[in-house]
A protein has these predicted regions:
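Intrinsically disordered, low-complexity segments enriched in small/flexible residues
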Residues: 1-19, 123, 151
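Structural motif
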Residues: 14-18, 35, 51-55, 87, ...
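A short, well-ordered alpha-helical element
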Residues: 27-50
Length: 155
């Protein structure tokens, strides 16, 4: 069923860009600036849209790729003078949230999981192994307050 708006020659078009999955520099099925660039460009240019909608369902991932994608969206929105609306489905955490804040407005379901940027950082601890091998951590700084740790050595 078509919606008709009186006095408009053409019904406004809203481009929809689905951003679903993990954000990472490479790999199939992952969001990154290189693979998304043509789709983002198309969303802002094809058919002269009145707005762009981002449908986001991402737990996040690479901070660099999140920044590049968000910057591309914001740059095109500003250049084309188009509003951007983010609609969060299940999750927009960490880098997914970063993508959402590139929009002018964010819409979420009460059941959506919304997370902060930098929620999780994972790594491996090998301090005991390193001590057994005779290795120790050394940090050198040249200014009094450069390092936040009182255990660090000052030069």
């Amino acid at each position: 069923m078509a919606i008709s708006i009186p006095f408009l020659k053409k019904t406004p078009t809203v481009a929809v860009l689905r951003l679903t999955g993990t954000i990472a520099a490479g790999g199939r099925g992952q969001l990154n600036d290189h693979t998304l660039a043509p789709y983002i460009e198309k969303a802002f240019t094809k058919g002269k849209p009145a707005a762009v909608a981002l449908v986001i369902n991402s737990p996040g991932g690479s901070p660099v790729q999140s920044s590049l994608i968000a910057a591309r969206i914001r740059r095109l929105a500003d250049d084309k003078k188009l509003p951007v609306f983010a609609f969060v489905e299940d999750v927009a955490a960490s880098g997914g949230y970063w993508l959402a804040v590139s929009a002018d407005e964010i819409w979420v379901d009460p059941g959506s999981i919304i997370g902060s940027i930098g929620v999780i950082s994972a790594g491996f601890g090998a301090s005991t192994f390193l001590e057994r091998q005779g290795l120790e951590r050394r940090v050198y700084t040249c200014l009094l307050y450069t390092s936040p740790s009182p255990r660090d050595e000052k030069v």
